[in-house]
Amino acid sequence: MSILSFLLGEKKKTASVAKERLQIILAHERSSHSAPADYLPALQRELVAVISKYVKIGNDDIKVNLERQDNLEVLEVKIEIPQA
C-alpha cells in the first residue's frame, strides 16, 4: 500500500458499485410486486390539498411510495416544490 493510496483512501471498484445498485433495484422490484396499500392514493390527494394552501403544486409534484422489507415498512414521500 502506498502512502498516497493510504491518504486518499481506496476507491470502490466499479463492480461493487454496480452490485450495490442492482441490489437496490431488486429490492425495489420485489417490494412493488406486493399489493399496494389502499390508503396511498387518498394520502397523496390529501397531501396535495394541504400543501396547495401554501404553495402552488399539482398532483404530479408528489410521489408516495410504500416499501416493504421483512417486518419493516417505509413510507417515502417526495414533494417537488417550485422555486419562488
Swiss-Prot record:
Positions in coiled-coil regions: none
Example GO BP: regulation of division septum assembly
NCBIfam families with a match to the protein in the record: minE (TIGR01215), PRK00296.1 (NF001422), PRK13989.1 (NF010595)
Record flagged with keyword Cell division: yes
Pfam families, A to Z: MinE
Lineage: Bacteria, Pseudomonadati, Pseudomonadota, Betaproteobacteria, Burkholderiales
Alphabetic keyword roster: Cell cycle, Cell division
Keyword Cell division attached: yes
Function: Prevents the cell division inhibition by proteins MinC and MinD at internal division sites while permitting inhibition at polar sites. This ensures cell division at the proper site by restricting the formation of a division septum at the midpoint of the long axis of the cell.
Family: Belongs to the MinE family.
Name this protein carries in UniProt: Cell division topological specificity factor
Lineage: superkingdom: Bacteria
